[in-house]
Amino acid sequence: MTVGDETAIFDFGNQMPKDIHETLEIVYSSLEEKGYNPINQIVGYLMSGDPAYIPRLNDARNLIKRHERDEIIEELVHAYLKK
């Protein structure tokens, strides 16, 4: 085989994307820790898509950006309406 014919391997290690519920718990607690109103900040992010609403503390900003906003909203509506 010549150089360039080999398949490159990318390893995520142990950093698999967290599920939406776990991500929201981390984001919520990070916002509380920073002294912000978590609900207002999360709604601001979901409506605008601006990650500045979410702090970098505990990697919250990077975690929430791993999920599509519409998927987060879908999960929230599902959890709210679940009986």
Curated annotation (Swiss-Prot):
Q: In terms of domain of life, where is this protein from? A: Bacteria
InterPro entries cross-referenced by the UniProt entry: IreB (IPR009309)
Record's family?
Belongs to the UPF0297 family.
Q: What is this protein called?
A: UPF0297 protein LEUM_0557
Name the species this protein comes from: Leuconostoc mesenteroides subsp. mesenteroides (strain ATCC 8293 / DSM 20343 / BCRC 11652 / CCM 1803 / JCM 6124 / NCDO 523 / NBRC 100496 / NCIMB 8023 / NCTC 12954 / NRRL B-1118 / 37Y)
